[in-house]
Amino acid sequence: MITSSRHPYYYTISFALLIAAGMWGLFWIPQRALEAGGLTGGWATISQMVIPFAMLLPISLWRLYKGQSFGLEYPLIGLLFGGGIACYANSFLLTDVVRALILFYITPVWTTIFEIVFLRQIPRFYRYITLALALSGVWIVFGQEGVIPLPQNSGDWIALLGGILIAASAVRMEIKKPEGIYPILFSFFFYGGLFTLIQSYFLSDYLGDAPSIESWVAMMPWLLLIAIL
C-alpha cells in the first residue's frame, strides 16, 4: 500500500481549491445566460472550449518551434478532464441547478474509489467525513419518499458522468505527473472541445438547434470575456 504524505503547501492548495470550487459552483449563471441569449444546442459549451483553444494555438506553435511541449501529449487526461467539464456545463441546460451541482460534487466518492484501485492509497479519516457529507446531500435531494437516490433524467446522468470523468482525470494526472500546467491546459481545451462536439451531436434532441448568426454576434463579447477569464 502507498500512503500519501502531506504537501508542504497543503493549506494554500486547499484554500485555492475552495475558491475554485466556489467559482465553478457559480458556473451555471453564465451558462444559462448564454443559452437565454440564443446559444442553444450546447454551443455555449462548445464555444468555451474552441475559443480558448484558438487563443492558445499560436502559443503552442511557438512552443513547438522552440522545441518545447506542444501540449497535445496527454490525450487521455485532456479527454477525461475536458469531457468532465463539458458534462458539468451541459447538465445545467438539462436539469435543475441543485441536482447538477449535487451529482457533480460527489466527485470525492469516485476519486476515493479510483485512488484505492489504481494508486493503492489508503484514505485519511477526513476523507470519510467528506464522503458522508457528499452522500448525505445526494440522499436529501434525490432520496425523497424513501426511494433509492438515483438520477432521474438525462441532465442528472450527465452531471454524474462529469464527476466520474473529473475524478478519473485527477488520478490519471497523479499517475503521469505532467511537467508544467500549459500542456494540461491546451490538452483540456483541444480534447474537451472534441468531446463537446460529439456530445452535442448525440444530445441534439435535448439541447436544441444550433444558434443563429445574430445570436453569435450578440454573445461573442461575453464568450471572449469568459475565455480570457
Q: Where do the protein language model's features map onto the residues?
A:
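Glycine-/small-residue-enriched transmembrane alpha-helix faces in small-molecule transporters
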Residues: M1-W43, C87, A132, S136, ...
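Loop-to-transmembrane-helix transition segments
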Residues: T12-A20, L64-C87, N153-G162, D209-L229
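Transmembrane alpha-helices of multi-pass small-molecule transport proteins
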Residues: T12-I13, G37-G83, W110, I164-S169, ...
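Membrane-interface helix termini and inter-helical loops of multi-pass transporters
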Residues: I29-G41, F142-S154, Y201-L223
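Hydrophobic/aromatic residues within transmembrane alpha-helices
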Residues: L34, A44, S91-F92, V117-L119, ...
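Structural motif at transmembrane-helix junctions in multi-pass transporters
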Residues: A36-W43, C87-L103, I181-Y182
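Hydrophobic transmembrane alpha-helices of multi-pass small-molecule transport proteins
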Residues: L56, Y126-Q144
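C-terminal transmembrane-helix exit sites in multi-pass transporters
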Residues: S60-R63, N90, T107-A132
